Swiss-Prot record:
Sequence ranges assigned to domain MSP in this UniProt record: 9-126
Role this protein plays: Central component in molecular interactions underlying sperm crawling. Forms an extensive filament system that extends from sperm villipoda, along the leading edge of the pseudopod.
Record has Cell membrane as a keyword: no
Tissues with expression: Sperm.
Keyword flag Nucleotide-binding: no
Domain of life: Eukaryota
GO-annotated cellular components: cytoplasm; cytoskeleton; pseudopodium
Keywords: Acetylation, Cell projection, Cytoplasm, Cytoskeleton
GO BP annotations, alphabetical order: oocyte maturation; positive regulation of smooth muscle contraction
Taxonomic path: Eukaryota, Metazoa, Ecdysozoa, Nematoda, Chromadorea
Protein name: Major sperm protein 38
Length: 127
């Protein structure tokens, strides 16, 4: 059963943070690449700490071993310096898919007793 094996590693490019540069009076979009470095098919979901300002597309999916997916990370216009951005980040959560499951994302994979791993990518805003 897939849930008894801990999910393997993923890699992200960039690896430690996402940087947006001023001005912030228009929407910005950057891209991150997520690579399934493991030997199993995994399901992933993306969370953000500020859903009004930050968006990710596609927000969830499934990918096979060694497969990579390109995600668009968007930052909507906001008043830089007047809003708290210290805790802004996106979190990649991933788990093994059940053996024999179709390559279609299912939210319940994250709600059972299987292990879910997380990687936080802080957002840095340059003035």
């Amino acid at each position: 059963m897939a849930q008894s094996v801990p999910p393997g590693d993923i890699q992200t490019q960039p690896g430690t943070k996402i940087v947006f540069n001023a001005p912030y009076d228009d929407k910005h979009t950057d891209h991150i690449k997520v690579i399934n470095s493991s030997a199993r098919r995994i399901g992933y979901g993306i969370k953000t700490t500020n859903m009004k300002r930050l968006g990710v597309d596609p927000p969830c999916g499934v990918f096979d071993p060694k497969e990579a997916v390109l995600l668009a990370v968007s930052c909507d216009a906001f008043a830089f310096g007047q809003e708290d951005t210290n805790n802004d980040r996106i979190t990649v959560e991933w788990t093994n898919t059940p053996d024999g499951a179709a390559k279609q994302f299912r939210r319940e994979w994250f709600q059972g007793d299987g292990m879910v791993r997380r990687k936080n990518l802080p957002i840095e805003y340059n003035p």
